[in-house]
Amino acid sequence: MKVRILTLFPEMFNGPFGTSILKKAQEKELIDIQCFNIRDFALNKHKKVDDYPFGGGAGMVMTPQPIFDCHHHVTQMLNLNEPCKTIYLSPKGSTFTQEKAMELAKEEQLIFLCGHYEGIDQRIIDELVTDEISIGDYVLTGGELPAMVIVDAITRLIPGVLSTEASYEDESFHCGLLEYPHYTRPRAFNGLEVPSVLLSGNHKDIDMWRRKQSIELTFERRPDLLKGLQLKKNEAQWVAELSKKKE
Ligand SMILES: CC(C)(C)c1cccc(C(=O)NCC2(NC(=O)c3cccc4nocc34)CCCC2)c1
């Protein structure tokens, strides 16, 4: 997969993309991530990339020309015969989910456009953006961190990026439930023990315990995730008992 990121702050990406799994994925050529500084494409003498909003109001808006020319340069270099999926990170976008990550992980190339200030000129969105995606409802300073989140979520889904055992952490493995509690050595830490079932070696009991923990945790903290799930009879019984307790 080729990922191209259009941003005013390419240096922000050095940490996350220069570390651990994302770094290794690039070294293994499973993903090719390149950042482009929109400011390099500004034609005005002072390399200005923002201007006052027509109609007045607080804040500044990113001007269309540098973004348009940067996007044109990137699409030329990708040398495609059809327009490239161009994702604008935006609070107005559809909320990013694991399902969306799995959908995007199938793409051959993706362009991410990161806004700044109050946002970008609408004409860019109308002409170049194919998808607007949001990572959640809070105010941020720019679209860069959302772009990193989405690239992280997508990259780990590319075959070969995660070692086989790690890839079982996928939603399909837990089928959308919150994860059971994790424990590792030592068996006693500050006088705190590990649940004995996990030390029993009885994998049927362990799997049952973990499944019950996941269902109870999901019921308590994210009942919305439970709604869409197919539970076995005994599991549905657990949920019914939890609901009764809650009444
Ligand atoms: C209702 C609520 C969501 C709180 C809201 C209303 C109005 C503005 C803002 C706001 O944050 N504007 C600033 C910018 N925000 C984001 O880019 C951004 C923010 C959040 C999630 C995201 N996922 O991708 C990009 C995201 C837009 C231009 C530069 C940064 C947020």
Swiss-Prot record:
Its main location: cytoplasm. The keyword Transport does not apply. GO terms for cellular component: cytosol. GO terms for biological process: tRNA N1-guanine methylation. Its EC number is 2.1.1.228. Disulfide bonds: none annotated. It catalyses: guanosine(37) in tRNA + S-adenosyl-L-methionine = N(1)-methylguanosine(37) in tRNA + S-adenosyl-L-homocysteine + H(+). S-adenosyl-L-methionine binds at residues 115, 135-140. Keywords: Cytoplasm, Methyltransferase, S-adenosyl-L-methionine, Transferase, tRNA processing. Homodimer. Specifically methylates guanosine-37 in various tRNAs. Belongs to the RNA methyltransferase TrmD family. This is tRNA (guanine-N(1)-)-methyltransferase. It comes from Alkaliphilus metalliredigens (strain QYMF).
